[in-house]
Amino acid sequence: MLCLSLNSSSTSPPKSPLHHSFSRRSMRSWVCSPRVQRKKLGFWSSPKAVLSAVSGAGSEAGKVEEAEEYDAIVIGSGIGGLVAATQLAVKGARVLVLEKYVIPGGSSGFFQRDGFTFDVGSSVMFGFSDKGNLNLITQALEAVDCKLRTIPDPTTVHFHLPDNLSIRVHREYDMFISELVNYFPHEKEGIRRFYNECWKIFNSLNSLELKSLEEPMYLFGQFFRKPVECLTLAYYLPQNAGDIARKFIKDPQLLSFIDAECFIVSTVKALHTPMINASMVLCDRHFGGINYPVGGVGGIAKALANGLVNKGSKLLYKANVTKILLKDGKAVGVKLSNGREFFAKTVISNATRWDTFGKLLKVEDIPQEEKNFKKIYLKAPSFLSIHMGVKAFVLPPDTDCHHFILEDNWGRLELPYGSIFLSIPTVLDPSLAPEGHHIFHIFTTSSIENWEGLSHKEYEEKKELVADEIITRLEKKLFPGLKDSVVLKEVGTPKTHRRFLARDSGTYGPMPRKVPKGLLGMPFNTTAINGLYCVGDSCFPGQGVIAVAFSGVMCAHRVAADLGIEKKAPVLDAALLRLLGWLRTVA
């Protein structure tokens, strides 16, 4: 039996660019219909799938009773939350996921317009390989008996940078290094030495069984099995990519290129990007590669949600959590905006830390550790996003799927609207658009402060003005005739992202206030409130698909240990958590 379909053609067009809606008829068809052609679907499942993972607005996947106590409640169904939930469900825990919206996925969701299927967030998908231990999306799907069909991307990203610097990051590592050396022959040795450092970290991480770094029995077990790899990671934990790069590279333009590489990873330059984060991305794009799921990125969350239900746990949509309930200082449940309350032994928040500790808890309940977190990290900016349907003639032959554009001034890299990230997923999967058309998905940084205090008319006019400027830049740099090719356009601002993704200020995630000590300051999954855990991009190791999936795996392991499902050592637990807490204070 097919697990899910990724192509629901009867979607009614909602009002906002990030609003996703479904008709009950189309949802029943992708769950139940055995006649849908397999090649039009993104994945397969074992013959267990019976319930829809997307049951419609305000409905439930699995009957949800308020009086029932769960082992874990997960607030939000982003990739981090879904990985944590499914990993716990597979271990036998009874999990309830509460999603504010009407489909799962958050930033990894999708929406449809006039035959176009758009990814809400990034189309650059890591974690789908069939080797190593960092193929975390593959592992998460396999755990719930699902598999997605994917299309390999031969080029991770094509950089278009100042001084006509045009570099393709080829899937084949040697091709990428050769292209980079061709531009910077005098830095040949430095290039290889810097990226070799990245590989040293990646290979160490990729060799380990990935579980919670807050669980001492696992941590010590890995150390005794792989001492060299563990010591390697410990050595690089407090270091940043920019410092390592400067040990080997002197050319300022090449260092600026590495800034651009890291900016894609973390929204900050290399000197502020932890070396471990950079290494995961800069190496996995060549090891496992970028692989796009057939039918769109939204299929990942839909598969995990469906798998969660198949494993006996539950998912409630249109469930807006407004409060985390505490009893004697312990998290015991949540309250929804409609007054419903649900109770569990543990609560896992997939919201940002600003939402979790700024909105879901009373001010007097916020621990000092979370106040310290806000002293080290601030909210990264949000994005202006433009989703467009365009006529196919505008694409030159052999156009790459992903592009990063910074035309004439390295100093504009981090500024609002300074750099542009463009995805054209139809280069890989034409089924996402009507015949003869392509999808353009454009991102550029923007802060919510720039969109506040406007009347509706002023807001709409500003959206059109800023979008037109961005499109004009793309037309001038890469795609002559782009404006005339546009058949559909949806513009999302930081206010859009705040509303539909439930992220404070629409933020991309945490960003260090000053030069960080690598990842030392980044909290793990446990919090100072007993029974409350966090998962997602506000936790170690940070932003990105691999990172939030890793966070989900770690969180599930730690929660399972605390529930008694996994082995634990209470005395060692307390000592390790104190040590990790102390390390964060020196960051």
UniProtKB/Swiss-Prot annotation:
Q: Name one GO cellular component term.
A: chloroplast membrane
Summary of the tissues where the protein is detected: Up-regulated in the flower buds and flower lip tissue, while it is weakly expressed in leaves.
Sorted keywords for this record are: Carotenoid biosynthesis, Chloroplast, FAD, Flavoprotein, Isomerase, Membrane, NAD, NADP, Plastid, Transit peptide
Q: How does it sit in the membrane?
A: Peripheral membrane protein
Annotated region described as Disordered, given as residue ranges: 1-21
**Molecular function GO labels:** carotenoid isomerase activity; oxidoreductase activity
Q: Where is the transit peptide?
A: 1-50
Q: What is its main location?
A: plastid
Does this entry carry the keyword ATP-binding?
A: no
Give, as in the UniProt entry, the pathway in which the protein acts: Carotenoid biosynthesis; lycopene biosynthesis
What function is annotated for this protein?
Carotene cis-trans-isomerase that converts 7,9,9'-tri-cis-neurosporene to 9'-cis-neurosporene and 7,9,9',7'-tetra-cis-lycopene (also known as prolycopene) into all-trans-lycopene. Isomerization requires redox-active components, suggesting that isomerization is achieved by a reversible redox reaction acting at specific double bonds. Isomerizes adjacent cis-double bonds at C7 and C9 pairwise into the trans-configuration, but is incapable of isomerizing single cis-double bonds at C9 and C9'.
Q: Which family does it belong to?
A: Belongs to the carotenoid/retinoid oxidoreductase family. CrtISO subfamily.
What this protein is called in its record is Prolycopene isomerase 1, chloroplastic
Lineage, uppermost ranks: Eukaryota, Viridiplantae, Streptophyta, Embryophyta, Tracheophyta
